[in-house]
């Protein structure tokens, strides 16, 4: 297993400067991470530099609250892909899920899936820290029904990040063929490997260098 190729090297802080984003890009190239995960305004900047590498460009949609309209999320995804994104991590409408508006949630995801079809992978952030286990299961089922490629635990901006028990539950729900991304709170190789053992196929972290070099990092 190549741990570096399971990492989305992440910088999503609102105050991230060009220099900070550049550092993430440079580290991703040096360590051959799977992707950089950056805010949409940096997609073209990253895409130009990573075009001739194995590092993908991942961005976020409806982030971090998930409360945009479906139309805006679909447009945001299309715009990001036009700018060079290979993967889009969208946030579900958490309030709609909790209101049991399941058709709305499914259609919200479907709009992004349709915008990305044939062009980019779609990961669905369900924000596990805000959900009951039953809601986590339902969110994963809706993401799978809508044709998403991955389910993802967290934005890193809520009350908690990835937990091994949540990864296990998500993997059990979506089955063996869909991706599961653990994001938020993974700081070292031991934590990353625990997530992978539980069923994660991707790790989202700002601490990618620490994870692959055996250190413990601070951050998302």
UniProtKB/Swiss-Prot annotation:
Active site (UniProt): 89, 152, 181
GO molecular function, one term: deoxyribose-phosphate aldolase activity
Disulfide-bond pairs as recorded: none
Keyword Magnesium in record: no
CC terms in the record's Gene Ontology section: cytoplasm
Record carries keyword Coiled coil: no
PANTHER family: DEOXYRIBOSE-PHOSPHATE ALDOLASE (PTHR10889:SF1)
Alphabetized HAMAP family for the sequence: DeoC_type1
Similarity comment text for this entry: Belongs to the DeoC/FbaB aldolase family. DeoC type 1 subfamily.
Name this polypeptide is given: Deoxyribose-phosphate aldolase
Organism whose genome encodes this protein: Enterococcus faecalis (strain ATCC 700802 / V583)
Species classification: Bacteria, Bacillati, Bacillota, Bacilli, Lactobacillales
Gene: deoC
């Amino acid at each position: 297993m190549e741990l570096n190729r399971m990492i989305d090297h992440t910088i999503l802080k609102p105050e991230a400067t060009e220099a900070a984003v550049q550092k993430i890009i440079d580290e991703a190239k040096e360590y051959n991470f799977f992707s950089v995960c950056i805010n949409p305004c940096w997609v073209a900047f990253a895409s130009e530099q990573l075009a001739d590498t194995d590092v993908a460009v991942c961005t976020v949609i409806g982030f971090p609250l998930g409360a945009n309209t479906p139309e805006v999320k679909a447009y945001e995804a299309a715009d990001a892909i036009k700018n060079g994104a290979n993967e889009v991590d969208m946030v579900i409408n958490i309030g709609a899920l909790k209101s049991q508006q399941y058709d709305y949630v499914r259609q919200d995801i479907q709009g992004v899936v349709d915008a990305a079809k044939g062009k980019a992978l779609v990961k669905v952030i369900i924000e596990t820290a805000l959900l009951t286990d039953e809601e986590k299961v339902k969110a994963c089922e809706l993401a799978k029904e809508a044709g998403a490629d991955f389910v993802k635990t967290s934005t890193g901006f809520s009350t908690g990040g990835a937990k091994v028990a949540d990864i296990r539950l998500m993997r059990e729900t979506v089955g063996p063929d869909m991706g599961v991304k653990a994001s938020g709170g993974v700081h070292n190789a031991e934590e990353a490997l625990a997530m992978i053992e539980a069923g994660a196929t991707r790790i989202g972290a700002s601490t990618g260098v620490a994870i692959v070099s055996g250190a413990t990092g601070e951050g998302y």
